[in-house]
Amino acid sequence: MAPPQHLCGSHLVDALYLVCGDRGFFYNPKGIVEQCCHRPCDIFDLQSYCN
């Protein structure tokens, strides 16, 4: 598994598409940017935004 990373902008959206796949995701910019851009996040953090 990959170590936690800072993901911002298009990198964050690409990671969500990769993790969530066909389920899609809900995009709450304030929450996910705070969690994954300002601080490093891991795959489990990203999965919490999947539908």
Curated annotation (Swiss-Prot):
CDD domains: IlGF_insulin_like
Pfam families: Insulin
InterPro entries attached to this UniProt entry: Insulin, Insulin-like, Insulin-like_sf, Insulin_CS, Insulin_family
Gene Ontology annotations for the cellular component aspect, listed alphabetically: extracellular space
Cross-referenced PROSITE patterns: INSULIN
Xref: Gene3D superfamilies: Insulin-like
Keyword Lipid biosynthesis: no
Cysteine-cysteine disulfides: 8-37, 20-50, 36-41
Family indicated by similarity: Belongs to the insulin family.
Entry function: Insulin decreases blood glucose concentration. It increases cell permeability to monosaccharides, amino acids and fatty acids. It accelerates glycolysis, the pentose phosphate cycle, and glycogen synthesis in liver.
Protein's name in the database: Insulin-1
Gene: ins1
